[in-house]
Amino acid sequence: MSKRSDYLEIHPYTKSIEEWMDDMLIPEEERGQIKGADVVALPVGYNGCEKSFASSTLDFIAYARQQGLFNVEICCPEYDFTNLELCSVKIRLGKFQLATAITGTIFWGVVSSYIYDLVKPLLPQITPIEHVESPRFHDAPEVSFSIVIPDSLGNKQEIIYDGPVEGIDKVGEVIKTLTNGN
């Protein structure tokens, strides 16, 4: 059963890492690394380019690896990576599948820190202005990402967020609920 509310969507997810590796034509010699990862970046597919990754995926992976809290890999052959840049101010992290529920809160901490580090330089500039012709120009940055995580019963759930930065705390709350079984 799917749930959707203000920029946040949660629904069951059934596709396995094995199926993703088959779809992405991952060579046998690269599969072990991906299977052994705590977190796997998956393609998001935009406008007919099904094997493409979000614009900030590689930067986020580099950031996550620098933190050293979990092993992250990308589900893509080394020779075939397609990074899609879209013209907007939105931070597009992409889709990530977590191997265990335990990784969820750690991963969320890294995601929220990464987003904060990106928007921190913009925050002092974001001030409410009452009389503006185009108020969207002054809005806070937006972010989109998807996290596939096993819940406390072992069923995978996909959490999709696409909205303003100030609303991402809801995702952390959902992750805690899913992984604690509450």
Where are each of the predicted segments found?
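Membrane-active, amphipathic/fusogenic segments and juxtamembrane/transmembrane anchors
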Residues: 1-80, 144-171
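Amphipathic, membrane-active segments
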Residues: 34, 114-182
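Surface-exposed beta-strand edges and their flanking turn/coil or helix-capping segments
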Residues: 54-56, 86-88, 172-176
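Short, surface-exposed, polar/charged, turn-prone segments marking secondary-structure boundaries
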Residues: 68-70, 100-102, 176-177
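Membrane-inserting effector segments that mediate pore formation, membrane fusion
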Residues: 78-139
